[in-house]
């Protein structure tokens, strides 16, 4: 009769390819990037969350390399701009590490705009940085985005999620600014969650642009943003959505 596997290491080994590059085992103790985790646990206890800062920069630069190679293959003449989404981690040490890599920022809520201002006040970013403002625009979020734009953050780009939002910004923007439009993509068949509550439908985008943006001196359309609920997969669904977006 085979031996019953009931240890945590058994679960790890049958679930993951282990050990991975970051991990090693020495004398039955786990090391992470040559850092003895048991020593840290003895000092700080558990549960414990560790942020390994060098990994942030390596992953950002990996993404840049992948895009640069792909762009070179098709002779794409544009540029790739990596934007770090602040909601993935609000910790200052994470943001400061990420921003060492010539990147830009994406916000999702009113709270995030305070982070942008704090980064500027401490000299970590300047007013030329791209600030992509996604998410549903509640009144405080609209007010905070406008305060950024009105104070000279020239590359702050609110992404319009519904037709009413553009009027909210018209009322509070004192200068001209760039805007984006979020496209409402179709859901993948059999997907359990409905995530296209935000965005403007393909068929409405041109009319919306002509009516609300084209002749409004406060706005210049800079971006079309579309969100695919399952991320980038090599499937007919993904490529069909992409074709609809760019055609």
What label would you give each PLM region?
Residues 1-177, 181, 206-210, 214-220, ...:
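A charged N-terminal "starter" segment
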Residues 8-10, 230-232, 237-247:
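C-terminal active-site-proximal or functional interface alpha/beta core segments in diverse enzymes
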Residues 186, 195-210, 240-244:
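Flavin-dependent oxidoreductase catalytic cores
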Residues 202, 215, 228-229:
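Domain-scale recognition of functional cores that engage charged ligands
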């Amino acid at each position: 009769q085979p031996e019953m596997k009931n240890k945590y290491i058994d679960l790890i080994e049958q679930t993951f390819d282990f050990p991975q590059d970051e991990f090693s085992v020495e004398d039955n103790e786990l090391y992470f990037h040559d850092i003895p985790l048991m020593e840290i646990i003895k000092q700080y206890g558990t549960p414990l969350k560790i942020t390994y800062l060098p990994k942030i920069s390596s992953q950002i630069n990996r993404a840049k390399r992948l895009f640069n190679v792909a762009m070179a293959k098709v002779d794409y003449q544009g540029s790739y701009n990596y934007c770090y989404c602040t909601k993935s981690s609000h910790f200052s040490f994470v943001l400061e590490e990420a921003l060492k890599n010539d990147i830009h920022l994406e916000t999702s809520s009113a709270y995030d705009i305070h982070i942008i201002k704090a980064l500027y006040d401490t000299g970590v970013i300047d007013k030329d940085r791209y600030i992509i403002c996604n998410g549903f625009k509640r009144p405080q979020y609209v007010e905070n985005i406008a305060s950024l734009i009105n104070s000279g953050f020239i590359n702050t780009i609110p992404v319009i999620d519904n037709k009413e939002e553009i009027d909210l910004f018209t009322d509070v923007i004192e200068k001209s600014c760039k805007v984006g439009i979020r496209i409402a993509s179709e859901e993948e068949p059999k997907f359990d969650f409905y995530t296209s509550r935000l965005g403007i439908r393909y068929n409405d985008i041109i009319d919306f642009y002509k009516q609300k943006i084209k002749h409004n001196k406060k706005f210049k359309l800079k971006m079309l943003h579309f969100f695919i609920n399952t991320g980038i997969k090599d499937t007919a669904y993904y490529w069909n959505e992409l074709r609809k977006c760019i055609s």
